[in-house]
Amino acid sequence: YEDRNFQGRCYECSGDCADLHSYFSRCNSIKVDSGCWMLYERPNFLGHQYFLKKGEYPDYQQWMGFSDSVRSCKVIPQQKGPHKMKIYEKEELKGQMLEVLEDCPSVFELFKNHDINSCNVLEGHWIFYEQPNYRGRQYFLKPGEYKRFSDWGSLNARVSSFRRVLDSC
């Protein structure tokens, strides 16, 4: 919806969309009827990322948005089964490494470091957060190697918390 509280012009989306600009000029509220989604601030799945699961978001601040700009979106495929990821202190999957299987509200408490410079997502989908307790900028990771922070769309290596995307979407 273009306006808060589900008012104004709206667009219903059922799959990935690389450019939403032709449907609306701003996005201030969203209803997610099913599944999990990543919203992107810019077209072609670029810019700030926002994770949404089923529910109502009457205001962009409810999804931790920095503005009313939503220009593309992707459905996160449901993935059942275990989650496993290796996080690294340095780029190119080097330096201190820690294998993780669970959500982490404080990377510093777990890893004794504020930065993750690379990671290898072995199983499941994950969300990195720039601040502790799942706050701040968000980055969606699917299975694969991320040899530097720019590979997951970040401008720096600051990752202060992360969580698994579970089947409950």
Swiss-Prot record:
Residues 1-34, 35-77, 83-123, 124-166 form the Beta/gamma crystallin 'Greek key' domain. One of its GO terms (molecular function) is structural constituent of eye lens. Residues 78-82 are annotated as: Connecting peptide. Keywords: Eye lens protein, Repeat. Pfam families: Crystall (PF00030). GO terms for biological process: lens development in camera-type eye; visual perception. PROSITE patterns: CRYSTALLIN_BETA_GAMMA (PS50915). It comes from the Eukaryota. The keyword Heme does not apply. SUPFAM superfamilies: gamma-Crystallin-like. Has a two-domain beta-structure, folded into four very similar Greek key motifs. Crystallins are the dominant structural components of the vertebrate eye lens. Belongs to the beta/gamma-crystallin family. Monomer. There are at least four genes coding for non-identical gamma crystallins in this multigene family. This is Gamma-crystallin 2. It comes from Rana temporaria (European common frog). The lineage of its organism: Eukaryota, Metazoa, Chordata, Craniata, Vertebrata.
